Amino acid sequence: MRLKIENAMKELKETIPFRVRFSEVDSMNIVWHGSYPLYFEDAREAFGRKYGLGYYDIFDNGYYAPLVELTFKYKKPITYGMKPEITIIYRYTDSAKIVFDYEIKDSTNGELLAEGHSVQVFMDRNYQLVWANPEFYEEWKKRWQD
């Protein structure tokens, strides 16, 4: 029987502020839906830098981590000039994938504006799906156990 370590892992998250640019809004002055994946990408990159699970860390170990699932839900409009913040939260899984949840909040009052979820899988250098956790990823998870 394999022991789950989900509850034994530290909560890994990162929060970054961002400014809504004019090029990211539609004619109603509301953030265009296509901008949200970019905000999530910025959060994933910040998380990777902070915790040592960035794209180059993955590449340097001989793998790619393509995004295979991305969802988001709008709660309140985000408009031009706002300065929200996005929090990315790592979600442990035994599977060979990287799972994140996201929350975008108004930095002035903490109100939830949007939330999302993403899943990345591992592929080897021959673009073949990897079904077992790569060794470096298992080691990374162990590093963050309580």
Task: Give residue ranges: language-model regions.
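Generic short beta-strand
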Residues: 22, 102-104, 120
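Hydrophobic beta-sheet segments that form the core/acyl-binding groove
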Residues: 72-107
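A structural microfeature
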Residues: 114-116, 131
